[in-house]
A protein has these predicted regions:
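Extracytoplasmic/secreted envelope proteins and their assembly/folding machinery
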Residues: 86, 108, 112, 186-189, ...
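Sec/Tat-exported extracytoplasmic proteins
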Residues: 91-93, 118-119, 190-196, 331-335
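Regulatory N- and C-terminal appendages and interdomain linkers associated
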Residues: 2-5, 11-76, 91, 298-337
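Solvent-exposed, acidic/flexible segments
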Residues: 101-108, 179-185, 192, 196, ...
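Conserved kinase catalytic-core segment
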Residues: 107, 113, 165-243
């Protein structure tokens, strides 16, 4: 019996070592990557060039990186992070994609195109109304978006390139770009898109082509109504149209509308309440000159290009028209400052 106990103890030790050693190695590898990237230049924006020629149907990845709408994808693993259902797949060429389901796929697809057009770094996101996935188990989240034969409905596909390494997250109030017009522009884009989920975890730092790229890597909580945990929404045309864009202006600064703090009576999570209250300041005290700069950039977009952002996201013709008109109104408001 004692011998059995010793054997069992040895097995358990080996089991836990088998779990902890790879985890420690992964942690050590990530730390080395962070240290190696420390001397690389940090960038948050690049000149988009001739904005009027950009293809906003395909966005940052272009047609070259677009997923095969008729292809079959192979299930890899489910991702339980965040609030939206997500899982990873591989296509026939071995390219890895992260599929997101729920309320965010359409809004995020459109949002990344507008951010990219303004010169900001984004993930390569595409929207497909249907995706066939083989080997798909019963999902712990999002099973209601799956029909017989492994057909997944209303999916956002994010291309995962091996060459891109995530080394961390960044904060709105502490980063290398505070005080620059490019950073002011990104702050204003959050109001233009009505992105109310401005948590640090949604901002990533990628190492790409010898530089550290700072980007908003989750823009799914957009094109709805900003507000508390009861009133806010995503991908909600009526809520977006009825939202105020510019809160107030002075000769020197502009405050843009942003509501994020929880309803006071539901604020049992005090740290979350404080975090979301602070988020409302992300879009405040923007230099007027910076607002004009962003307006001039976005003003180069044609009405058709703006519509393409929403067509690419699978919205109906009426929704495409509604969202596009509201975006145009907000761009016009920037240029009228």
């Amino acid at each position: 019996m004692r011998r059995f106990g010793r054997v069992l103890k040895t097995v358990l030790i080996l089991f836990f070592l088998g779990i902890s050693i790879p985890a420690e190695a992964q942690k050590h590898g990530k730390q080395k990557a962070i240290e190696k990237a420390a001397d690389l230049p940090a960038v948050i924006w690049r000149d988009p060039g001739n904005i009027s020629t950009l293809n906003l149907v395909y966005g940052a990845g272009g047609i070259e990186h677009a997923p095969d709408s008729n292809g079959t994808y192979t299930f890899d693993k489910e991702d339980m992070n965040g609030t939206s259902p997500k899982f990873d797949v591989k296509d026939g060429q071995g390219v890895k994609w992260r599929i997101k389901l729920g309320q965010e796929p359409q809004a995020e697809t459109a949002a990344t195109r507008l951010l990219w057009a303004a010169g900001y770094f984004v993930d390569e996101d595409y929207y497909l109304p249907e995706v066939k996935v083989q080997g798909l188990p019963k999902l712990r989240r999002g099973q209601n978006f799956v029909s017989e034969g492994g057909i997944v409905h209303r999916a956002r596909l994010e291309r995962k390139e091996k060459e891109i390494k995530k080394i961390g997250n960044w904060e709105w109030f502490k980063n290398p770009f505070v005080g620059t017009k490019e950073f002011s522009g990104l702050r204003m884009m959050m109001s233009l898109l009505n992105n109310w989920d401005l948590k640090k975890i949604n901002n990533s730092i990628y190492v790409v082509d010898g530089e550290q790229r700072y980007l908003v890597s989750d823009a799914g909580a957009t094109f709805g109504k900003t507000g508390n945990n009861i009133s806010r929404s995503k991908s909600d045309l009526k809520g977006y149209e009825e939202s105020k864009f510019i809160e107030k202006e002075t000769p020197a600064e502009v405050d843009f509308e942003m509501h994020s703090r929880p309803f006071l009576l539901t604020a049992v999570d005090v740290p979350n309440y404080h975090e979301r209250t602070k988020m409302e300041n992300v879009t405040k005290h923007i230099p007027r000159a910076d607002a004009k700069w962003l307006g001039q950039l976005l003003g180069q977009l044609s009405e058709e290009q703006i519509r393409d952002c929403f067509r690419a996201a699978g919205y109906t013709p009426d929704e495409v028209e509604g969202y596009s008109k509201e975006v145009q109104k907000r761009i016009a408001a920037l240029n009228a400052l």
